[in-house]
């Protein structure tokens, strides 16, 4: 080859553990959202970037789930007048560099102060990209913590086991002070609801005992994300709903989600979306937990 093309430089094929790295195999693992499998094809230094990639994938899968009751999707804006699909997508793109920073900075150890610092910068970037619209603050919190914990474990131990993951998330969240003056904080105070920080400090118990097993049981179902969203809505104290419509609105959302799950159909989803738009109900907290469930499913080795 060198005789034919004098300027030709032959680059050795990348290897991992003495075996050639297959780009096709890596892409297949990424498409499936399988961190453990993908790690077999990449050097250790690449793992944090892979974790961030799977986090972005989870956020986009939630956004792309269509139709969703009361939420922004490819079809409409749900109960929102200040955001649409394009804005939500732009928000995710703005957050991506910070998800990568969280993963890289946490590769050796968890530093709650650093997580908070990057999180604040990420929120500012999100608001700048969206013109001041809070599109992903809740998702940034839960996904950001989880990215840091997952990257730390994957890089230090080569695997993300549920017990260790929950321990790290709980430890990091316990060092983050409670927020004041937010819609979620007000809803938590007024309705005695469990907020996002409390859920994180408890290491998302319902996710591991209920939502994740349910999501995994629906593998191959084209409405897997839709049904999981509805399932989460039946059990979560969604502070987004409480802020907009109070306890009555939350009870209505839970009952309608349970009813639709019993007799599921795509047309039923569309009807529920119309109902939620009319009632000004947006299950944003449930959407955040769907994103988190998708992400955790992609990185965790077990659920116990």
Label the model's feature ranges.
Residues 97-149:
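Long, hydrophobic/aromatic-enriched structural stretches that serve as scaffold segments
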Residues 39-42, 137, 244-245:
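Short coil/turn segments at secondary-structure boundaries
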Residues 22, 91, 139-143, 225, ...:
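Catalytic-loop motifs flanking and including active-site residues across diverse enzymes
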Residues 48-108, 112-116, 150-274, 280, ...:
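Phosphate-rich cofactor/ligand-interacting catalytic cores and adjacent structured alpha/beta frameworks
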Residues 1-50:
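Active-site cores that bind ATP or allylic diphosphates and position pyrophosphate for catalysis
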Residues 132, 280-281:
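Residue-level signal for helical boundary/lining positions with a hydrophobic bias
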Residues 124, 140-152, 231, 290-297:
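Contiguous, well-ordered alpha-helical segments that form the cores/surfaces of helical PPI scaffolds
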């Amino acid at each position: 080859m060198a005789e034919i093309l004098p300027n030709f430089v032959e680059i050795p094929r990348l290897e991992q553990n003495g075996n050639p790295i297959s780009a096709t195999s890596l892409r297949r693992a990424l498409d499936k959202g399988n961190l453990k499998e993908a790690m077999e094809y990449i050097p250790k230094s690449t793992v944090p970037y892979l974790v961030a990639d799977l986090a972005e994938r989870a956020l986009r899968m939630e956004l792309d789930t269509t139709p969703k009751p009361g939420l922004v999707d490819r079809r409409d804006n749900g109960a929102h007048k200040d955001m649409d699909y394009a804005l939500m997508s732009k928000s995710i793109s703005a957050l991506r560099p910070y998800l990568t920073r969280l993963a890289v900075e946490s590769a050796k150890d968890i530093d709650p102060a650093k997580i908070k610092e990057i999180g604040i910068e990420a929120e500012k970037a999100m608001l700048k990209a969206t013109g001041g619209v809070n599109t992903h603050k809740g998702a940034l919190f839960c996904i950001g913590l989880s990215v840091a914990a997952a990257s730390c474990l994957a890089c230090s131990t080569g695997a993300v086991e549920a017990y260790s993951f929950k321990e790290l998330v709980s430890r990091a969240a316990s060092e983050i002070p409670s927020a004041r003056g937010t819609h979620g904080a007000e809803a938590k105070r007024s309705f005695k609801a469990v907020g996002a920080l409390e859920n994180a400090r408890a290491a998302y118990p319902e996710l591991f005992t209920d939502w994740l097993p349910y999501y995994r049981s629906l593998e191959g179902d084209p409405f897997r994300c839709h049904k999981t969203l509805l399932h989460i809505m039946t059990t979560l104290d969604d502070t987004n709903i409480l802020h907009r419509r109070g306890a009555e609105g939350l009870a209505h959302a839970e009952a309608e989600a349970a009813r639709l799950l019993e007799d599921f159909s795509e047309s039923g989803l569309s009807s529920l979306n119309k109902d939620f738009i009319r009632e000004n109900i947006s299950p944003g907290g449930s959407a955040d937990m769907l994103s988190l469930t998708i992400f955790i499913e992609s990185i965790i080795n077990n659920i116990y």
